Amino acid sequence: MADFDTYDDRAYSSFGGGRGSRGSAGGHGSRSQKELPTEPPYTAYVGNLPFNTVQGDIDAIFKDLSIRSVRLVRDKDTDKFKGFCYVEFDEVDSLKEALTYDGALLGDRSLRVDIAEGRKQDKGGFGFRKGGPDDRGMGGSREPRGGWDSRDDFSSGYRDDFLGGRGGSRPGDRRAGPPMGSRFRDGPPLRGSNMDFREPTEEERAQRPRLQLKPRTVATPLNQVANPNSAIFGGARPREEVVQKEQE
């Protein structure tokens, strides 16, 4: 994976500092704070991300926290990143710390970080709501610890309509999915939520810490397809061809 080891450490103060308190003037306006979950999964919605974001960027943003899985939401038809993702943490303290990143500036974007709202399922298990018209799968991971199903939803309470059309997501962004058969739908968040987002003023922007990525050290994608014209065995030739040449 490309090297993304340096976000500005000044942006990572302890809970309640640096990035603007939730619901304060430095945040996204007046909002009702959600209760932290008392049992897994401990999942955060992260929105308003640059469209060239990759998993390594998310790992770097939350590098000091205990991340279990990352799900980058992509358009079903174009496979383009839609500007938001879901990050599950191993314990509630990491989720609590992640919430303090809400309002931090990444380039000219003000990050949105919130608790992904969960709801109990009729048949057991725990799901998330993030409304949308269609169901999309989000499977694939390393260290499998529970399946990902698409029949239930995710909801963060943010309005991401400007991030693009509805669509699905590409499987297998990072590690295992949440336990107890959690399920997802990855369309834009529900309207009419209990949180309102407003763009920060210039004064507020000046007070917020800025997150900066170093250039990626790997210029060529690691999963790039090999050149089909390249010789698999270098300059080696079949044995029959070698014998024929010696006889000549």
UniProtKB/Swiss-Prot annotation:
List where Polar residues composition bias occurs.
220-230
Q: Which SMART domains match?
A: RRM
InterPro entries in the cross-refs = eIF4H_RRM (IPR034229), Nucleotide-bd_a/b_plait_sf (IPR012677), RBD_domain_sf (IPR035979), RRM_dom (IPR000504)
Domain RRM, chain residue ranges per copy: 42-118
Q: Where is this region: Disordered?
A: 1-41, 121-248
UniProt superkingdom: Eukaryota
The entry's cellular-component GO terms read: perinuclear region of cytoplasm
From the Swiss-Prot or TrEMBL record, give the protein name: Eukaryotic translation initiation factor 4H
Q: Where is the composition biased (Gly residues)?
A: 15-29
Q: What are the GO BP annotations of this UniProt entry? A: developmental growth; eukaryotic translation initiation factor 4F complex assembly; formation of translation preinitiation complex; sexual reproduction
SUPFAM superfamilies recorded: RNA-binding domain, RBD
Q: Which residues carry this modification: Phosphoserine?
A: 13-14, 21, 24, 32, 230
| Database matches in CDD domains | RRM_eIF4H (cd12401)
PTM-bearing positions, type N-acetylalanine: 2
Per the record, a Pfam family? RRM_1
Query: Which terms does the record give in the GO molecular function aspect?
Result: ribosomal small subunit binding; RNA strand annealing activity; RNA strand-exchange activity; translation initiation factor activity
What spans are recorded as compositionally biased (Basic and acidic residues)?
Answer: 131-163, 196-207, 237-248
Q: Which compartments does it reside in?
A: Cytoplasm, Perinuclear region
Residues annotated with Omega-N-methylarginine modification = 19, 22, 136, 166, 175
Identify the Gene3D superfamilies for this entry: 3.30.70.330
Q: What does this protein do?
A: Stimulates the RNA helicase activity of EIF4A in the translation initiation complex. Binds weakly mRNA.
Q: Which UniProt keywords apply?
A: Acetylation, Cytoplasm, Initiation factor, Methylation, Phosphoprotein, Protein biosynthesis, RNA-binding
